[in-house]
């Protein structure tokens, strides 16, 4: 099933679209729910309800995992189901599973890397092409690297959520976005990166 409030009368899958989440939640044949809504509300309620109903959940929702991941992982463990969120960091580059499983016996002292492709593109343009921030951002938007509303990227929110997820898995204690000083790149000038 696909939960969507819109109608798709011409779709060959129109009988799979539902407007009531309980249809999905109460169907014993559904064992995995994929959340693609984003944000916290109503995603959190749907994901939590799915886990409590004994259904595994797959999501790429960074905000949900960063803010509610510890609770949702605990519920999944208690219910004997999976809560998968590999695509929430690195667009599916395998980092979550290795941190959670393969590297769990290792002591991790530091996490370093490029956490946001949009800001990396913008900063690279500023450094290599001496572009002003606004011009580099507009270029990123024109090429499809930046959203029309790029605030989550350029204000550091996206990177903050990702580092919370990675730090929580690496250091064994949930790290919340509110506890991380977050500063974006909007005030950086070409002179700053020269």
Give the location of each predicted region:
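Rossmann-like NAD(P)H-binding beta-loop-alpha module
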Residues: 30, 77-146, 153, 157-158
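Rossmann-fold NAD(P)-binding glycine/threonine-rich loop
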Residues: 37-53, 60-102
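General beta-strand structural signal in soluble alpha/beta enzymes
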Residues: 17-18, 35, 58-60, 83-87, ...
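A generic structural signal for short
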Residues: 34-36, 60-61, 124-125, 152, ...
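Conserved beta-strand termini and adjacent loop/short-helix elements that scaffold enzyme active sites
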Residues: 5, 20, 86, 178-180
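Substrate-binding/catalytic subdomain of NAD(P)-dependent oxidoreductase enzymes
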Residues: 135-194
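N-terminal glycine-/serine-/threonine-rich beta1-alpha1-beta2 phosphate-ribose binding loop
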Residues: 1-52
């Amino acid at each position: 099933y696909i939960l969507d409030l819109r109608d798709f009368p011409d779709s060959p899958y129109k009988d799979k679209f539902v407007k009531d989440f309980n249809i999905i939640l109460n169907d014993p044949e559904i064992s995995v729910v994929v959340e693609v809504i984003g944000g916290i509300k109503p995603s959190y309620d749907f994901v939590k309800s799915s886990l409590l109903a004994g259904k595994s959940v797959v999501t790429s929702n960074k905000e949900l995992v960063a803010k509610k991941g510890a609770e949702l992982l605990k519920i999944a463990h208690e219910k004997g189901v999976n809560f998968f969120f590999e695509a929430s960091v690195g667009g599916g580059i395998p980092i979550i599973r290795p941190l959670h499983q393969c590297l769990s016996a290792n002591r991790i002292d530091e996490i370093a890397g490029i956490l946001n492709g949009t800001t990396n593109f913008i900063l690279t343009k500023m450094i290599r092409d001496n572009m002003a921030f606004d011009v580099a951002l507009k270029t990123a938007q024109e090429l499809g690297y930046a959203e029309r509303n790029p605030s989550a990227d350029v204000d550091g929110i996206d990177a903050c959520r990702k580092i919370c997820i990675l730090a929580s898995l690496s250091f064994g204690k949930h790290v919340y976005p509110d506890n991380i000083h977050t500063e974006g790149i909007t005030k950086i000038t070409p002179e700053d990166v020269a």
